[in-house]
Amino acid sequence: MKRIILSRKGFDSKAGGTASPIFSDGKLVSIPIPQASPSPKKYKDLDFDGITGTQLLKEVSAKVSPNDYCHNDPLLNESIGIFGQAGSAQTELKNRGVGPGDLFLFFGWFKNFSNNGNDIHHLFGWLQIEKILEGTSKIKKYLKEKNIEHPHGYGDTSRFTNNAIYVAKNNLEVLGQKFKAKGHGLFKQTHQKLVLTEENRSRSRWKLPSRYFKNSDSLFLNRMKWQNKNACTIFYKGFGQEFILDVETNPSVKKWALGIIKKHG
């Protein structure tokens, strides 16, 4: 594992227009963004351990209709974990050396609507890469063989330039050591250890655990940077999707990621 990618997914201010929900019992579900063209799923078709897509939209008072198509990606609650990427974001991942063994940590905008909670950035899932399939023909062939429907291999995919999917390992693995934790999955309950946002700050103000991040060296490989390195705070700017961390030279950050997966995954 040389790279950890903090990957922003789910409803945002432009796509969906509201946060994904944290329910009163602590469950959280990332709502996929809308997709204008036909995709494998409409919102009414979604089911996250008994919580339907229609319930999700109602919980957050979304303007999206249950009959609208959604971009249901990444797939983290299925037997095979898959994440699709394309365009400039995929180019960035490739150019920064993201490959097999590396780990995506997915985060998004969440809020507990039942108690008018704060807007926060919260981790909701992970995927460790087993292999990368590039090009629509390879993607469609693989998905057909596995009987999987995924937006990046469904119907007309011409809008996905530089199309790729990342397939998950069966189990989490580091330096040949396999763990009991799956190679992909969801954090299904909220926990402070999964919150990126600094307490009582706007969601764009992050504070990462100094125990793991304080002495990091040249950690950020693309647009992310420290606001205060000693305090491990970040002012999250812009709408980039993929934030790539060098954990080959910062192994303590790897310990942080593995720890939260093993404890909360």
Q: What name fits each language-model region?
A:
Residues 51-120:
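Short N-terminal edge-element motif at the start of the domain
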